[in-house]
UniProtKB/Swiss-Prot annotation:
It comes from Pseudomonas putida (strain ATCC 47054 / DSM 6125 / CFBP 8728 / NCIMB 11950 / KT2440). It holds the Pfam family MarR_2. This is HTH-type transcriptional repressor NicR. Residues 66-89 bind DNA. The lineage of its organism: Bacteria, Pseudomonadati, Pseudomonadota, Gammaproteobacteria, Pseudomonadales. The gene is nicR. Induction: Expressed both in the presence and in the absence of the 6-hydroxynicotinate (6HNA) inducer. Transcriptional repressor for the nicCDEFTP and nicXR operons, encoding the lower aerobic nicotinate degradation pathway. Acts under non-induced conditions: repression of the nicCDEFTP and nicXR operons becomes alleviated in presence of 6-hydroxynicotinate (6HNA).
Length: 158
């Protein structure tokens, strides 16, 4: 678990608290913007951004348990279960019992899922481009670096 900043250790700041200037609020707005762009630009209008991330994780890591997908996608257990069910209903993934532990289910990309993923890659590149909006090359590198740094500091603290 990461160390929490307590009020006594937080820097004193007497300026009024403006939620619209806080990192969580700004990240949420940026994510909402990205999600809207994804839905408008996706080659498959039925595919959500997190379903796309899940398909990418399966492509990158191969057949995976739901626990492995949770780690690869940063999605909680209840959400990943629903994502997998929706992808299965579209025959983009298939499920099979884990040979090492029959209680576990292994999720695997189907040929249809791999084909959709291949078709989506050019769209995904365009979505990323649009999501970055008017940021110049240096700003794009900086924002990705800073986001990774925020994530890495949280993972290293645990």
């Amino acid at each position: 678990m990461s160390k929490k900043t307590t009020p006594s250790s937080a820097p004193l700041d007497n300026t009024p608290y403006d939620v619209t200037e806080q990192v969580g609020h700004l990240l949420r707005k940026a994510y909402q913007r990205h999600t809207a762009i994804f839905q408008q630009q996706a080659c498959d209008p039925q595919l959500t951004s997190i379903q796309f991330v899940t398909l990418c994780a399966l492509r990158d890591h191969g057949p995976s348990s739901q626990a492995e997908l949770i780690k690869a996608t940063a999605v909680d257990q209840a959400t990943i279960r629903g994502i997998v069910e929706r992808l299965k209903a579209r025959e983009l993934v298939q499920l099979s019992p884990d040979p090492g532990d029959r209680r576990k289910v292994i999720v695997e990309l189907t040929e249809s899922g791999a084909a959709l993923l291949d078709a989506m890659i050019p769209c995904a590149r365009q979505i990323s481009e649009l999501s970055m909006g008017s940021l110049n090359a240096g700003e794009r590198v900086a924002i990705l670096y800073l986001l990774r740094k925020m994530i890495d500091s949280d993972e290293n603290a645990g």
